[in-house]
């Protein structure tokens, strides 16, 4: 089994601009397994699953697939909405039937709810090429959806649809088991996100890079925050999705692992006790994806524009490549204490771009947008090597013009609280591929059906 090089100690010389000073991270591995409300022998397991398979042997290993360094792939969850009402529409099964089998990349798949489709790009070296996959598939889905009276949008949550009116995708044992186990919280998962995979060329690097990326989780979350509303209410949070999703027992922040063997041991424990049946049921905000040889960042709220997806993809790719170079050079990766990581997640879920985050183990603080500007400058040489400079610089445009949650709140304010107007703006953004910075009038006929902060 592997142990990791480059962990511990202070880096020689001052920290680079935009990167916190490096200290040794000292925390015990978190091995808390939630108590399960018993259904069958204390566990809820997929029908027909073998509780002894694969990971009952403590010597079992999890192979990390070979992959081309820093290639990336994108997954974009998209909601189907009714053209007239703006409500969520259970149109995904019909759309998927019209699209045909997902046999190659890029492709479209179903998700937990029948109102959702997910677009998966092919792996690419350049962020722009992965984003182009997504936009081509969006155009194809839109052409099929339009005659059905269905429109497409992406945000962390829907502004006013009700969770209890949504349908779970039938015929999927994994989804049925999730809902059976998690009940009320599982049914509340009316949320959407973007996932960014970046390939890592050496398994020994994976867990240190995951730890390093957790330092930048608040940056990811602030840039993508797009869920200020829930069931017709203004929540006061930039990313309500971030706090909703972590209610699932295997979601939220990942534990710290000393090495790959400890990660394998934890997976064996969870398999043996029925907490998970397959590795993908570990739904952490940032996680290893051994099947693809990648690290998967799942922190991002649903993003309504291809332009912004390119920005967060480039930022993620550049950080992973930067950390990989640091490890190659024998240097350590900056990490934070787990209590600071948790606090940063809450702060940016609550305050978004106005959050003051904890930068380093010493507890120094800084406005997240100021730290993002410095981070972009520090990563520009890496971006030049990866061919994603333009996409990385789009991070600055999000800072200057506002993240999705800010735009949604502005639309609601400009239209006397119309959440249907918010949905309309999200639909326009997805089709245009760029943020909608217009301010609709309260007299716009597309928004007169809904006022007072709720949809009529």
Model-derived segments and spans:
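Well-ordered mid-protein domain cores that form the structural environment of catalytic cofactors
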Residues: 124-191
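Short proline/glycine- and acidic-rich turn/helix-capping motifs at secondary-structure junctions
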Residues: 158-162, 227-237, 332-340
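Compositionally biased, low-complexity flexible segments
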Residues: 1-52
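Helical (often loop-to-helix) elements that flank the catalytic cores of nucleotide-handling enzymes
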Residues: 134, 172-181, 200-221, 304-317
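Glycine-rich, mobile lid/loop segments that gate access to catalytic sites or pores
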Residues: 203-205, 211, 221-242
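An acidic/histidine-cluster motif and surrounding catalytic segment
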Residues: 196
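Short, low-order "capping/linker" segments at domain edges
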Residues: 164-176, 236-249
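C-terminal accessory/tail domains of diverse enzymes
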Residues: 57-148, 178, 245-456
């Amino acid at each position: 089994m592997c142990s990791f090089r480059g962990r511990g100690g202070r880096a020689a010389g001052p920290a680079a601009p935009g990167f916190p000073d490096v200290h040794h991270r000292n925390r015990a591995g978190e091995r808390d397994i939630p108590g399960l409300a018993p259904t069958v022998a204390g566990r809820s397991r997929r029908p027909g699953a073998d509780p002894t398979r694969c990971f009952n042997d403590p010597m079992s290993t999890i192979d990390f697939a070979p992959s081309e360094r820093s290639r990336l792939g994108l997954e974009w969850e998209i909601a189907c909405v009714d053209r007239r009402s703006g409500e969520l529409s259970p149109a995904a099964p019909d759309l998927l039937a019209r699209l045909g089998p997902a046999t190659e990349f890029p492709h479209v798949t179903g998700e937990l709810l029948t109102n959702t489709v997910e677009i998966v790009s092919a792996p690419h070296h350049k962020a722009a090429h992965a984003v182009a996959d997504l936009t081509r598939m969006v155009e194809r889905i839109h052409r099929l959806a339009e005659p059905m009276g269905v429109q497409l949008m992406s945000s962390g949550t829907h502004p006013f649809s009700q969770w209890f009116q949504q349908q779970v995708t039938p015929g999927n044992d994994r989804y049925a088991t999730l809902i059976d186990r998690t009940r009320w919280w599982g049914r509340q998962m009316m949320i959407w996100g973007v996932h960014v995979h970046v390939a890592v060329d050496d398994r020994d690097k994976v867990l240190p890079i995951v730890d390093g990326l957790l330092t930048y989780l608040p940056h990811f979350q602030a840039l993508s925050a797009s869920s200020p509303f829930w069931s017709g209410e203004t929540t006061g949070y930039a990313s309500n999705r971030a706090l909703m999703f972590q209610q699932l027992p295997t979601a939220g922040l990942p534990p710290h692992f000393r090495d790959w063997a400890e990660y394998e041991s934890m997976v064996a424990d969870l398999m043996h006790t029925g907490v998970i049946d397959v590795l993908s049921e570990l739904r952490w905000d940032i996680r290893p994806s051994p099947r693809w040889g990648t690290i998967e960042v799942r922190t991002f709220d649903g993003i309504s524009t291809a332009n912004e997806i390119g920005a967060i993809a480039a930022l993620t790719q550049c950080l992973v490549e930067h950390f990989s170079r640091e490890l190659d050079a024998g240097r350590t990766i900056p990490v934070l204490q787990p209590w600071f990581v948790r606090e940063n997640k809450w702060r940016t879920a609550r305050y978004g771009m106005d959050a003051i985050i904890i930068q380093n183990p010493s507890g120094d603080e800084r406005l997240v947008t100021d730290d993002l500007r410095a981070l972009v400058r520090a990563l520009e040489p890496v971006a030049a090597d990866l061919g994603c400079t333009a996409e990385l610089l789009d991070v600055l445009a999000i800072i200057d013009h506002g993240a999705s949650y800010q735009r949604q709140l502005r639309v609601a304010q400009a239209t006397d609280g119309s959440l249907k107007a918010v949905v309309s703006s999200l639909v326009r953004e997805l089709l245009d591929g760029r943020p909608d910075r217009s301010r609709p009038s309260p007299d716009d006929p597309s928004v007169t059906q809904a006022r007072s902060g709720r949809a009529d």
